[in-house]
């Protein structure tokens, strides 16, 4: 078997495999087991596989035609950093209705592919992507549905460390598949740069 994109321990330490206590029929194929406390655990091998697939897929697009969004707080820095590193556009925070469908909207954009951090939280962006007929790459947890999702990356899509690691790997895969870096080891940006800072008051 091919090695993981990062050591298995790194995936587990970031909590990538930790799902929720709900599961949908759509996500059944990505679930490894259910814990005694009722929490569903995701199959990290499938996360790893899907990150490879998504990286190859996204590398085919012009960087500025990729849009990554996250309404979820812990996904906002990861999508912003993903944008900086890959040249993609990023909308961290609230997604204004009409951003992709109404040319009158101030920051109107016409992407060719959309990345959502959570199909449920990012439902407005998802809806507009469906309307304009562009492919959708989504980070999906055990309680998500896969309607309209073209490439699903099964992961904890709520955790701060999990989201940082997933977007870090995805950024590295995009650059690697574009041949902008010769090997994955050439990606020198620390994963911490993708992590949402917590400001204690």
Curated annotation (Swiss-Prot):
Gene3D superfamilies, A to Z: Glucose-6-phosphate isomerase like protein, domain 1
GO cellular component terms attached to this protein's record: cytosolic small ribosomal subunit
InterPro entries associated with the record: Ribosomal_uS2, Ribosomal_uS2_arc, Ribosomal_uS2_CS, Ribosomal_uS2_euk/arc, Ribosomal_uS2_flav_dom_sf
GO molecular function, one term: structural constituent of ribosome
A GO biological process held by the record: ribosomal small subunit assembly
Domain of life, per lineage: Archaea
CDD domains: RPS2
UniProtKB keywords: Ribonucleoprotein, Ribosomal protein
HAMAP family linked: Ribosomal_uS2_A
UniProt name for this protein: Small ribosomal subunit protein uS2
High-level lineage: Archaea, Methanobacteriati, Methanobacteriota, Thermococci, Thermococcales
């Amino acid at each position: 078997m091919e090695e993981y994109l990062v050591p298995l321990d790194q995936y587990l330490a970031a909590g990538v495999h930790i799902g929720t206590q709900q599961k949908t029929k759509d996500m059944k194929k990505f679930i490894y087991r259910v814990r005694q406390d009722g929490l569903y655990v995701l199959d990290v091998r499938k996360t790893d596989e899907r990150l490879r697939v998504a990286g190859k897929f996204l590398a085919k697009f012009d960087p500025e035609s990729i849009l990554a969004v996250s309404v979820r707080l812990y996904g906002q820095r990861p999508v912003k950093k993903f944008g900086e590193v890959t040249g993609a556009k990023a909308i961290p925070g609230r997604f204004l209705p009409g951003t992709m469908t109404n040319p009158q909207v101030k920051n109107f954009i016409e992407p060719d592919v959309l990345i959502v951090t959570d199909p449920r939280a990012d439902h407005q962006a998802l809806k507009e992507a469906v309307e304009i007929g562009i492919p959708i790459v989504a980070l999906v947890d055990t309680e998500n549905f896969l309607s309209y999702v073209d490439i699903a990356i099964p992961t904890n899509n709520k955790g701060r460390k999990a989201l940082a690691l997933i977007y870090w790997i995805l950024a590295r895969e995009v650059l690697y598949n574009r041949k902008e870096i010769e090997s994955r080891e050439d990606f020198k940006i620390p994963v911490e740069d993708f992590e949402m800072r917590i400001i204690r008051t």
